[in-house]
Amino acid sequence: MSVRLLTVRLIKHGRYILRSYCKRDIHANILDQNQLKTRSKRGFPLPSTAANVLRTTPQQAAKSVVNVVPRTINSPSGSPFNGSGSSPTSSSGIFRVGQHARKLFIDNILSRVTTTYSEDLRQRATRKLFFGDSAPFFALIGVSLASGSGVLSKEDELEGVCWEIREAASRLQNAWNHDEISDTLDSKFTIDDLEIGPPIAKGCAAVVYAADFKKDVASDGASLHTDAQPQATPAFAPNSWSTHEMMSPLQNMSRFVHNFGGSVDNVFHYSQPSAASDFVGAQSREQDQRHHEQQQHQNQEQEQHQNQEPSSSAFNVTSPANSNINSSVDSYPLALKMMFNYDIQSNALSILRAMYKETVPARQRGMNEAADEWERLLQNQTVHLPRHPNIVCMFGFFCDEVRNFPDGHLLYPVAQPQRINPQGYGRNMSLYLLMKRYDHSLRGLLDSQDLSTRNRILLLAQMLEAVNHLSRHGVAHRDLKSDNVLIELQDDAAPVLVLSDFGCCLADKVHGLRLPYVSHDVDKGGNAALMAPEIFNTMPGPFAVLNYGKADLWACGALAYEIFGNRNPFYSSSGGMARERGEMTLSLRNSDYRQDQLPPMSDACPPLLQQLVYNILNPNPSKRVSPDIAANVVQLFLWAPSNWLKAGGMPNSPEILQWLLSLTTKIMCEGRPQMGAGLMPVASCGNRRAYVEYLLICSFLARARLRRIRGALNWIQNVVA
C-alpha cells in the first residue's frame, strides 16, 4: 500500500469518526415530532408529555433540554440506573462505534474493487480538455503542424495525390465504357425486337447467334442502332465530364513539386524505353534478320515460278472470304446468347433464379415492379460486377420463349421444345443474353495468327487486369479457359481481351470469396483441369472453406503457357489423332504436382514474366502473389523505366508518383476517346494501335496505390537480385 493511499484513508476515516462524535441527534427528534403530528391529525389521544412537546416551540424545547437533569434511581450497589435498567449513554456510544466500524469496513472493501479515483481523474481530465485548460493541448498540435511532422505525413499527402489520379482515370474509364444500348433496354424488350443472324458458336449449355436491332426499332431510338459496332460514346459529349474535371491531378502538379521536389520537366524523364520495349526490340531484330533470310529465299523461288497463276488465284480466293466475314460482323454487330433450358419451368422468375450467375456482368439490370420479394432478395445478395474494358460487354438480359432459329435442328435438336422438335426435351422459355459481338476466342486467335511478343504480353496484362477486377469486387470466375476468353480485333491494332461466360462464377455478398464447404453438394466450379490445387484438394467438413482469392489467378498462370506459344501443362494430348501423329503427351495433375515439375516457357516470354508465371502456379497459395501485385508487375514491365527492374533500382515514393503523373498526362492528352469511323473510340492523336495500351494504362491508374506498387517493385527486386 502506498503512502499516499494510506494518508488519504486516514484522513477520510478520521473525518468520519469526528463527525460521528460531534453529530447531534436531530433526525430522531424530527422523526418523533412528525409521528406525533400525524397521530393528532387522525384524532388519536396523545400522552401528556407528547402534548406538551407539541405545544412547545423549538426554542422552548431547546431550553428545556438544557435545564432538564435526568432522574436516576440508586441501586443497591450504588450505581445509578434509569427506569429501563441500562445506561443510555454507554449503549448509544457502543452502537455508534459499531455502525462506523461497519461503514469503514464496507468502504475499505469498495475502495479495493471499484475505480473511484481513476474515474474521478478521467472525468476531471475530460472536463479540462473540453471545457477548460485545453490551450496547452492545442498548442502542442499547432507546434507539430508548424514543424511539418503533423497528423498528415508525407506518405499520406502522396496517397492523396494518388487518390486524385485514381479519380481522374476512373472518369476517363467510365467514358470509354459508356454505351447507349444498355441505357435504352427496358423490361418491355423481347426477342421480336432483334433480327437474328447465323449461329456463331455453340457449347454444352448455350448457343450464340449473330444479331442486330430491327430497322423499325432503330427508328424509334436514334441512338439504338448504327451501321457499325456499338461502342463507347465520345468523352466530350454534352453529358460527359469536362477537361477541367478530367485533368484534376495536373492542377496539383505545383503542390507536388513544392512539397516533394523535382520539376514538371521530370515528367518527361519517364518516357524512356521500358524493359518491355528493350526485350521486344531485341526480339524484333532477331525476327527481322530471320525474315530477311526467308524473304531472300522466297524471292529466288518466285523468280522461278513468276509466270505461274495458281498462287495468285489462291490468293484471290481467300480475300472474298475474309470480306464476307467482315461484312457479316458489320451487319450483325450484336451477339445473342440463348441458354438451354431442360428442367426449369417456363417462368421468368424461375429461370432468373436458376441462371442468375449468367447475368453478373450485365450492364442493365431492369427490375420488374411486380417482382416477388425473393427475387429482390436474390438480386441484393448477388454481386453486380461494374463495367471494365476487359470484361464482356453484356448490354442486358431478358426471358422469352424459344424460337426456331437458323440451324437449330442441326446444332441443338435435343434442346428444342417439342412444339418445334417432337424429339426435343427443352422447355418453351429460356434466358437470353444480349452482348457485343467479338471476333475470336483466345484459342481461335492463337491457332489462326502468329502474334508478336508485345501483343502476347498485352494479352497477359489484360487477363490479369480482368482477374484483378473480379477479385476486387468479390467475384470468382471459376471456369477460366481459352474458349471463355474472347478477343476483339480492329485493323492492325493489338487485340482486346475480355472474360466471358460467368455461368459457373461465385458472386455472393454474404460469403464473398470464402465459400463454406460442408458437403459435396457445394459446387466447386466448372473446369476441373484448370482448378486451383487448394480448391481441388479441399475435402468437405463442418469447418472447411473454399478460398477462391487466388484461384482464378492460378488459372491465368496456366493460360499464360498458351499465350506464349507453349502447350498447357495441365492439358493432355492422348488418343485419336494425337496417337497417330506421335504427339501423345502427359499432363501435370493439379492435385499433386510440384513447382519444379513445371515445364520451361518459350523464349518469347521475358525472364521476369516467366518467374511471375512460375510464382502464380505455386501449389501453395500463401506463396503466390496477389492478383493486384501480379497485374502491377506486368504493368511495370510494360511502362516503367527499365532501370527500376534492375538490381538496386528501387525508386522512392516521389519518383513513383512522378511516373504516375506522367502516365496520367499521357492518357489525358493523347488517349482521350474520340469518335472515329464507325463510332470506334480512338486516341485523339488518331493512332488506333495505341488504343489497347491506353486502356491498360487507364485500368492501372484507376486502381493505383503507392503501397501496392511498392509491393510489386519489392517482388521484382527480389527476383532480379
UniProtKB/Swiss-Prot annotation:
Major localization listed first in the record, in broad terms: mitochondrion
Binding site for Mg(2+) 2: 484, 501
Transit peptide location on this chain: 1-5
UniProt KW keywords: ATP-binding, Autophagy, Cytoplasm, Kinase, Magnesium, Membrane, Metal-binding, Mitochondrion, Mitochondrion inner membrane, Mitochondrion outer membrane, Nucleotide-binding, Phosphoprotein, Serine/threonine-protein kinase, Transferase, Transit peptide, Transmembrane, Transmembrane helix
Subcellular location: Mitochondrion outer membrane; Mitochondrion inner membrane; Cytoplasm, Cytosol
GO cellular component: cytoplasm; cytosol; mitochondrial inner membrane; mitochondrial outer membrane; mitochondrion; Nebenkern; synapse
Cofactor(s), names only, from the UniProt record: Mg(2+)
Compositionally biased intervals (Basic and acidic residues): 285-306
Catalytically driven reaction(s): L-seryl-[protein] + ATP = O-phospho-L-seryl-[protein] + ADP + H(+); L-threonyl-[protein] + ATP = O-phospho-L-threonyl-[protein] + ADP + H(+)
Catalytic site: 479 (proton acceptor)
Gene ablation phenotype (knockout): Adults display various phenotypes that appear to be the result of mitochondrial abnormalities and/or mitochondrial dysfunction.
Annotated stretches, region: Disordered: 279-322
Post-translational modification: Proteolytically cleaved. In healthy cells, the precursor is continuously imported into mitochondria where it is proteolytically cleaved into its short form by the mitochondrial rhomboid protease rho-7. The short form is then released into the cytosol where it rapidly undergoes proteasome-dependent degradation. In unhealthy cells, when cellular stress conditions lead to the loss of mitochondrial membrane potential, mitochondrial import is impaired leading to the precursor accumulating on the outer mitochondrial membrane (OMM).
Residue ranges with Polar residues bias: 310-322
UniProt: Mg(2+) 1 binding residues: 358, 501
Mitochondrial intermembrane topological segments: 6-136
Tissue expression pattern: High expression in the brain and retinas. High expression in the head and testes. High expression in the thorax compared to the head and abdomen.
Residue positions, PTM Phosphoserine: 346
Subunit structure: Interacts with park. Interacts with rho-7 and HtrA2.
Family membership: Belongs to the protein kinase superfamily. Ser/Thr protein kinase family.
Protein name: Serine/threonine-protein kinase Pink1, mitochondrial
Organism of provenance: Drosophila melanogaster (Fruit fly)
Biological classification of the source: Eukaryota, Metazoa, Ecdysozoa, Arthropoda, Hexapoda
